[in-house]
């Protein structure tokens, strides 16, 4: 039946893309976007919007795409999202907006993410910018971190007339968008830098190389620099490890370090001062999106890559699209297996991993079946690089240097979900700094909620 199947999106061939860092997905052209937009039923009670953490008016922007009013479609999206070109590429739409699309009950859901990407890319190519506030309201707000939570909070506050400054610890803005997600999924100059410039075009200042807690403390920002409120969106950058023998060997990386050095610092380029050792045979431990990113990056650097994950394929937390792409490119999945030791040679370098096979038992607290070791099933695999992708936690630097800021046992900042308010008056927080490692769009949703909370707080003080 007509309309049941979505317009396919063009991609690089797997064998070709496995050798380069160019973007895998080409996205829709105008004709493809209009055709896909025509599949939208324009539901009066749009369930897709309920699945969007930043509440984009999805039917409205798609209706404009259908009529080829691409600029108006962009302005509708940018009312709610500061990062549409990013979200269109990396959001898990299949479990959010597209997961609730009525079309999906009898066919393919509308490709909402691909349409959002098309609109954002079209706007960038045609020099269209989000609308700026007409005048400032006289209030200063500091935002810590220029990742998705910080950029969203800053952008929303700037639209309301606030004088906003973002403080970024690294030399380049973007947070995890710049250092964590590979070029082949999210181009840095073409997309991330352009989205950052759009936020700056709203009137937001961004100061890089400022480490809050070292360069300056939150209390100093509020007491000496005149900032009336602070939003903490500093992310979760401390990697977790397994605690098994051999983890201190040369050739063991956290996925965070491996991706940062390749994405942000281009350490794979010849002549780089501190080149990264990527090895000929790489083992990536973990099954999330970050594990897929690390594995696919190592593959592009010329390695044979194995992903070791202690559960089965159905339990992989990575997006199905990322798993599909990894398999197409030739990455080997060793499922229901878990490392017990990293083997080290006489010079302190990785020479292999000892692995035990697993089986699934009863469900754990997350609802997934718990992996159980199979006695006597251990074996050894040769490799020269191991990348641990086991999640991250927030750096305690900010919380340990800010009086009255409450954290939980995981060192995450305690903040209310609806406003981002913390235990310290005038200080708000959201994203991975509060939840631990999560998705880009959830961090954006938290930044949006905090912007609303800060506006209500400062408006209340003014009255």
Regions found by a protein language model. Name each.
Residues 72, 135-136, 140-144, 196-244, ...:
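Feature captures the FAD/FMN-dependent oxidoreductase FAD-binding
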Residues 163-166, 170-201, 205-207, 295-341:
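Rossmann-like dinucleotide-binding cores of NAD(P)H-dependent redox enzymes
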Residues 248-279, 363-437:
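FAD-site-proximal beta/loop scaffold in flavoenzymes
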């Amino acid at each position: 039946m007509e309309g049941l199947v979505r317009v396919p999106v063009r991609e690089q061939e797997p064998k070709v893309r496995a050798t380069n860092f160019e973007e895998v997905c080409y996205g829709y052209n105008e004709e493809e976007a209009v055709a896909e937009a025509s599949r939208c039923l324009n539901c009066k009670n749009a369930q897709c919007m309920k699945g969007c953490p930043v509440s984009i008016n999805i039917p409205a922007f798609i209706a404009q795409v259908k009529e080829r009013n691409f600029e108006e479609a962009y302005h509708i999206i940018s009312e709610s999202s500061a990062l549409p070109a990013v979200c269109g590429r990396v959001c898990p739409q299949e479990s959010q907006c597209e997961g609730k699309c009525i079309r999906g009950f009898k066919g393919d859901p509308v490709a909402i993410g691909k349409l959002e990407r098309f609109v954002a890319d079209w706007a960038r190519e045609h020099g269209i910018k989000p609308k700026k506030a007409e005048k400032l309201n006289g209030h200063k707000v500091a935002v810590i971190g220029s990742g998705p939570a910080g950029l969203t909070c800053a952008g929303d506050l700037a639209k309301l007339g606030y004088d906003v400054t973002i403080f970024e610890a690294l030399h380049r803005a973007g947070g995890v968008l710049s250092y964590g997600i590979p070029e082949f999924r999210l181009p840095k100059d073409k997309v991330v830098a352009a989205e950052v410039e759009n936020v700056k075009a709203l009137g937001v200042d961004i100061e890089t190389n400022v480490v809050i807690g070292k360069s300056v403390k939150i209390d100093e920002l509020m007491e000496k620099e005149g900032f009336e409120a602070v939003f903490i969106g500093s992310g979760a950058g401390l990697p977790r490890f397994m605690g098994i023998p051999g983890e201190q060997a040369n050739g063991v990386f956290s996925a965070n370090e491996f991706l940062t050095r390749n994405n942000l610092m281009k350490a794979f380029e010849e002549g780089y001062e501190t080149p990264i050792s990527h090895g000929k045979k790489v083992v990536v431990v973990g099954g999330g999106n970050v594990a897929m990113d690390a594995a696919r990056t190592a593959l592009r650097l010329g390695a044979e890559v194995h992903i070791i994950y202690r559960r089965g394929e159905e339990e992989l937390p990575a997006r199905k699209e990322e798993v599909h792409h990894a398999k197409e490119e030739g990455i080997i999945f060793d499922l229901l297996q878990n490392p017990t030791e990293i083997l080290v040679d006489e010079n302190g370098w990785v020479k292999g991993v000892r692995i035990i096979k697993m089986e699934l038992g009863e469900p754990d607290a997350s609802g997934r079946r718990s992996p159980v070791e199979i006695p006597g099933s251990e074996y050894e695999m040769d490799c020269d690089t191991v990348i641990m992708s086991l999640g991250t936690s927030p750096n305690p630097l900010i919380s340990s240097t800010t009086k009255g800021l409450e954290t939980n046992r995981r060192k995450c900042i305690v903040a209310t979900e609806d406003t981002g308010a913390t235990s310290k008056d005038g200080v708000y927080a959201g994203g991975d700094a509060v939840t631990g490692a999560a998705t880009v769009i959830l961090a954006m949703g938290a930044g949006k909620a905090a912007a609303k909370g800060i506006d209500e707080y400062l408006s209340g003080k003014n009255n």
